[in-house]
Curated annotation (Swiss-Prot):
Pathway: Amino-acid biosynthesis; D-alanine biosynthesis; D-alanine from L-alanine: step 1/1. The lineage of its organism: Bacteria, Pseudomonadati, Pseudomonadota, Alphaproteobacteria, Rickettsiales. SUPFAM superfamilies: Alanine racemase C-terminal domain-like (SSF50621), PLP-binding barrel (SSF51419). The modification N6-(pyridoxal phosphate)lysine is found at K34. This is Alanine racemase. It is an enzyme of class 5 (isomerase). Substrate binds at R133, M297. Belongs to the alanine racemase family. Its cofactor is pyridoxal 5'-phosphate. InterPro entries: Ala_racemase, Ala_racemase/Decarboxylase_C, Ala_racemase_C, Ala_racemase_N, Ala_racemase_pyridoxalP-BS, PLP-binding_barrel.
Length: 355
């Protein structure tokens, strides 16, 4: 097991959830816990949020749904965003998982198994209003409007859609999607609706409908919510190098002075991108320390020359992610997003849950 530790503060995640619930007022707030809770632990996060009365959990696949159902029991709703396929339909039924149906083929499959089991099967419908990934097209929606028998045997619980650019509050595309969604919903007046992802919650009450589906904001990937994640790594090696010494593969860093270089036990095998080579920073006792040389599979080097000698020793912990270096801040260094930083947190890291 890695010497590095990811600490996840469940109290912070719960507080983020309560903030979002407060903004949504009377609308329900679920939680996106796909990709193992954005790399932080879907089971642990879901159990914590159940304590705050969260009852809707969104996963990507049936496999994720089964794992969550086994951990949580039957008293919650687990929604499978990728929908249903012939190979996993029986599994969804067995584990009481609700598929989000994204096209007419998935509706057909779910109807087939409704007939096979001779009972109503619950589902959500996903209407594509402009993100153009998953979701029923305008032509498919029109078919549903004109032929309600296409939904026979299905217990339609929610109609959902997904915003493409909700992080940009003033972008007119948000309103375009909202208006398309409302136009479709008028043909399904008795069905509950869900549109707001994390960013959508902050667009205002018009976007909240009956259920909001935050993911990123729960995990601190929003300016108004707090980061619950800390990643720390101990110094495992120290060396004194003279002027003009080369560091790491391909000698991409050369010392410009006599230097003290420390080595930390993480690398790209742990999801710490090679793009951080010779850029980025870690923190030791709140002080910024630069990464020097190439990020290798299991190791990175940092220049600790400017730290007080009393703070440089084997076992001293460096903070890679935390209050000084949030996932969003780290992501900006290499041109990605905080989501990727979190979901790339390696399986070798020890996970520690507090709060």
């Amino acid at each position: 097991m890695s010497l590095c530790t990811v600490e996840i503060n469940l109290s912070t995640i719960k507080n983020n959830y309560l903030l979002l619930q407060d903004i949504c007022k009377t609308s329900l707030v679920g939680a996106a816990v796909k990709a193992n809770g954005y790399g932080l632990g879907a089971v642990q996060i879901s159990k914590a949020l159940i304590e705050e009365n969260c009852r809707h959990f969104f996963v990507a696949s049936s496999e994720e749904g089964v794992n969550l159902r086994n951990a949580l029991g039957l008293d919650v709703n687990i929604l499978v965003l990728n929908g249903v396929f012939e190979h996993d339909a029986l599994e969804l039924i067995e584990y009481n998982l609700t598929p989000v149906l994204n096209n007419l083929k998935q509706i057909e499959i779910w109807q087939k198994f409704s007939n096979l089991k001779n009972r109503l099967l619950s589902c959500y419908l996903h209407f594509n209003t402009g993100i153009n990934r998953l979701g029923l097209s305008s032509d498919e929606i029109e078919q549903l409007i004109n032929d309600r028998d296409l939904l026979k045997g299905l217990d339609l619980q929610y109609i959902i859609s997904h915003l493409a650019i909700s992080e940009e509050i003033d972008n007119p595309y948000n309103l375009e999607q909202l208006n398309r969604f409302k136009a479709y919903l008028q043909y399904f007046p008795n069905v509950k609706a869900s549109l707001a992802n994390s960013g959508g919650i902050f667009l205002g009450q018009d976007y909240h409908f009956d259920l909001a589906r935050p993911g990123a904001a729960l995990y601190g990937l929003n300016p108004l919510t707090k980061n619950p994640v800390t990643l720390k790594a101990p110094i495992i090696h120290l060396q004194n190098l003279t002027l003009d010494s080369h560091i790491g593969y391909n000698m991409t860093f050369t010392t410009k002075r006599d230097s003290v270089i420390a080595t930390l036990p993480l690398g790209y095998a742990d999801g710490f991108s090679r793009n951080f080579s010779n850029q980025g920073e870690v923190f030791i006792n709140s002080r910024s320390v630069p990464i020097v040389g190439r990020v290798s599979m299991d190791l990175i080097n940092i220049d600790v020359t400017d730290l007080p000698p009393s703070e440089i020793f084997l076992g001293q912990e460096a903070e890679i992610i935390g209050n000084y270096c949030t996932p969003d801040k780290i992501a900006s260094i290499i041109g990605t997003i905080g989501y990727e930083v979190l979901t790339n947190l390696g399986s070798r890291y020890k996970r520690k849950y507090i709060g």
